[in-house]
Amino acid sequence: MDIDREKEGKCLTVTVPCYNSESYLERCVESLLKERDGLEIILVDDGSTDRTGQLADQYARAYPDVVRVVHKKNGGHGSGVNAGLMLANGIYFKVVDSDDWLDEAAFHKLMSVLRFWCRTKEEKRPDLVVCNYVYDHLEEGKTKAVRYGNLFPEQKICRWDEIGCFSPEQYLVMHALIFRTGVLYNCGLKLPEHTFYVDNLFANCPLPFVQRIYYLNEDLYHYYLG
């Protein structure tokens, strides 16, 4: 990671790719703004034809030290992630889709942990932080949490040879992961444009570059299923 970017003092960059998201963008962004200390939010307006871009600009004006906006022609979800990663100043990087949101209490604990790691020497920081995520069927009033407590030791950094065996429902997905930004740069991550399921590439391509892992047993990410 570029040394000058680390000196910006941002601990976490959250990139939110947005396309025609005016009906739910507020829920997403408001969940992120609960933790502004050390946080950078990059809203990537991917050529929206509704008021998404205007809403994003309103947040940037209201929170100029936290929120940045990118307006670009439509390139798909992967293109939005790429745009956010190129501008990221945070030591850590996470993607949150615009129709999803983060749990307030879990996000507070995550940011507390990340702020601690960001104050330590680079060689002592985890390359990857893993949290639980929740499938939210809002219309049906049903939720299903995917947790990793049987796989990773808690409250310590571990390596791959210290974790358990994954069940078919416990594969690592984008929603569960917070990468050190330098890992994403080192692996040369660039997602294809106009392509479905690029979140699988985001989750898996950097893993060979990950050595140190920290598991936070919190239901952080809410994945909206309409």
State where each predicted segment sits.
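Nucleotide-sugar donor-binding/catalytic module of glycosyltransferases
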Residues: M1-G226
